[in-house]
């Protein structure tokens, strides 16, 4: 029997009473010793600087709402925590919920006004969209498709590090899909741009929402076909082949980047394939 999901998205009526809520400000999400979900009625009594409110889904069967604040404030007995920390430390179902909430919050902040005429927009009831009456324009949450690929050569994997990475960490190659190209075209282009390597036998491995701030990661495995590694200036700090028995520090366990690496290690060793989170 398939275990029911703890978190499911939905567009809920913000005029309804009750439910739970998460609070997002410029310092992350509000939390206390019980977590990031609070009784909605209790939050309303705090008179927080709410910029917008959104009904976002159900967690363990309970309706959940999102309060987007104009700025973070001090709440007695609570603290603020960034989304990445929830991914690294907390319940993955909670991270999925907060990842969705973070993307809704980003969309709500960026589309308070119409990009065509500058007039204020309004939420459309029953739909995840903002609306400009003047231009008859609907504004939906942004999703940015991107690819991530593990390139392999026998018992070696090609890993690279960006100047933005934490010290010492290496990961698979990644990049955003350009208008007019397929995900597969993107993989070939990005690998060539970033390390000047040709690839073959592309295999789709799965996808993962990456809410930093609104990426949809499409994961691939590819085999090395030729070329010497030449890191892209300003984008790739270092790139090299690593033997599977001598790997550097890797991305977080819950990331698709780590999954691609672990899946290949399992394939080479004959171990069971890992499960892609989320």
From Swiss-Prot:
**Sites where the protein binds a divalent metal cation 1:** 174, 194, 235
* Coiled-coil ranges from the UniProt annotation: none
Per its UniProt record, what InterPro entries does this chain match?
NAD-cap_RNA_hydrolase_NudC, NADH_PPase-like_N, NudC-like_C, NUDIX_hydrolase-like_dom_sf, NUDIX_hydrolase_dom, RNA_Hydrolase_NudC, Znr_NADH_PPase
Q: Has keyword Hydrolase?
A: yes
Q: Which CDD domains match?
A: NUDIX_NADH_pyrophosphatase_Nudt13 (cd03429)
Phylogenetic lineage: Bacteria, Pseudomonadati, Pseudomonadota, Gammaproteobacteria, Pseudomonadales
Annotated protein name in UniProt: NAD-capped RNA hydrolase NudC
Query: Where in this chain does the record put each Nudix hydrolase domain?
Result: 141-264
Q: Which UniProt keywords apply?
A: Hydrolase, Magnesium, Manganese, Metal-binding, NAD, Zinc
Q: Does the keyword Transit peptide apply?
A: no
In terms of Gene3D superfamilies, this protein maps to: 3.90.79.20, Nucleoside Triphosphate Pyrophosphohydrolase
Cofactor(s) needed, names only, are:
Mg(2+); Mn(2+); Zn(2+)
Q: Which residues bind Zn(2+)?
A: 114, 117, 132
**Cellular component, GO, one term:** cytosol
Where do the annotations place substrate binding? 84, 127, 140, 208-215, 257
**Hey, which family's this protein in?**
Belongs to the Nudix hydrolase family. NudC subfamily.
- Binding positions (a divalent metal cation 2): 190
Identify which top EC class this enzyme belongs to. hydrolase
């Amino acid at each position: 029997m398939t275990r029911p999901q703890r978190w499911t998205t939905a567009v809920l009526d913000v005029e309804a009473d009750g439910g739970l809520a998460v609070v997002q400000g410029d310092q992350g999400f509000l939390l206390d010793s019980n977590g990031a979900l609070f009784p909605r009625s209790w939050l309303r009594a705090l008179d927080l600087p709410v910029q917008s409110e959104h009904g976002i889904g159900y967690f363990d069967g309970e309706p959940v709402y999102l309060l987007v604040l104009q700025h973070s404030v001090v709440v007695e007995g609570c603290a603020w925590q960034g989304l990445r920390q929830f991914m690294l430390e907390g319940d993955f179902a909670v991270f999925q919920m907060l990842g969705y909430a973070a993307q809704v919050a980003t969309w709500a902040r960026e589309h308070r006004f119409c990009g065509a005429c500058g007039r204020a927009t309004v939420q459309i009831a029953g739909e995840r969209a903002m609306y400009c009456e003047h231009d008859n324009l609907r504004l939906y949450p942004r999703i940015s498709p991107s690819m991530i690929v593990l390139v392999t050569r026998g018992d070696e994997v090609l890993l690279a590090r960006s100047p933005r990475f934490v010290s010492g960490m290496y990961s698979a190659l990644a990049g955003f899909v350009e208008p007019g190209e397929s995900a597969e075209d993107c993989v070939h282009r990005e690998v060539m741009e970033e390390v000047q390597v040709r690839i073959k036998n592309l295999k789709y491995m799965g996808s993962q929402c990456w809410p930093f701030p609104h990426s949809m990661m499409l994961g691939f495995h590819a085999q090395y076909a030729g070329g010497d590694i030449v890191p892209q200036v300003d984008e790739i700090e270092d790139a090299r082949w690593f033997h599977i028995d001598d790997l550097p520090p890797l991305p977080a366990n819950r990331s698709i980047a780590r999954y691609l690496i672990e899946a290949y290690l399992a394939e080479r060793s004959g171990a069971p394939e890992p499960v892609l989170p989320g």
